[in-house]
Amino acid sequence: MINKTYESIASAVEGITDGSTIMVGGFGTAGMPSELIDGLIATGARDLTIISNNAGNGEIGLAALLMAGSVRKVVCSFPRQSDSYVFDELYRAGKIELEVVPQGNLAERIAAAGSGIGAFFSPTGYGTLLAEGKETREIDGRMYVLEMPLHADFALIKAHKGDRWGNLTYRKAARNFGPIMAMAAKTAIAQVDQVVELGELDPEHIITPGIFVQRVVAVSGAAASSIAKAI
């Protein structure tokens, strides 16, 4: 019997080791898998490479992981904003590396990894510092930059509902990078508000099929509510 559900956050993040590359879902705090991140902090794993849309908000979720000193490098599209002071302080002190990737390229590089695409050409970033050291090519009179896929050892994502096969549905903006990150990682770990019985999820509403998800863990109602308030 296929059963991808885990009883606790701690068991769901077991096996994440020093030096892992981890994708973290979320657009700001929307869809941020805060409980999984807290579980990751508790493992004590260090020297992590984090791939995410931004570099943390306030002192929760991804920012808390940065505060714990667990991260060696961040790959993201939007590292600076009014509440990204944790990352800002670490970066200015030379304690963390940064790779900036334009948001469209970030999404496409993740999707390329999940789809088995070796590389792709994008016009975004041509002629800027972001294109330094990368192959360029003229196609139909326009210049493009060769972008490589982004793979990860693990993906931490947040979904609304899941079943024991790993099928997932999302709520509104919380969906964001979750589906493509699940495809691009060797092990996708999803925290959900509710685990439902097989057949309860309308196949037309399933965004991430279970084939792309290895672990599912339910977050308690109280914990989910506290995260929602933070969002």
UniProtKB/Swiss-Prot annotation:
Reactions performed catalytically: 3-oxoadipate + succinyl-CoA = 3-oxoadipyl-CoA + succinate
A GO BP entry: beta-ketoadipate pathway
Binding site for CoA: G25, G26, F27, G28, T29, A30, G31
Pathways per UniProt: Aromatic compound metabolism; beta-ketoadipate pathway; acetyl-CoA and succinyl-CoA from 3-oxoadipate: step 1/2
SMART domains according to UniProt: CoA_trans (SM00882)
Pfam families xref list: CoA_trans (PF01144)
Alphabetical keyword list: Aromatic hydrocarbons catabolism, Transferase
Organism domain of life: Bacteria
UniProt-listed Gene3D superfamilies: Glutaconate Coenzyme A-transferase
Disulfide bonds: none
GO molecular function: 3-oxoadipate CoA-transferase activity
Entry EC no(s): 2.8.3.6
Broad class of enzyme this protein falls into: transferase
Subunit field text: Heterodimer.
Family that this chain belongs to: Belongs to the 3-oxoacid CoA-transferase subunit A family.
Protein name per its UniProtKB record: 3-oxoadipate CoA-transferase subunit A
Gene: pcaI
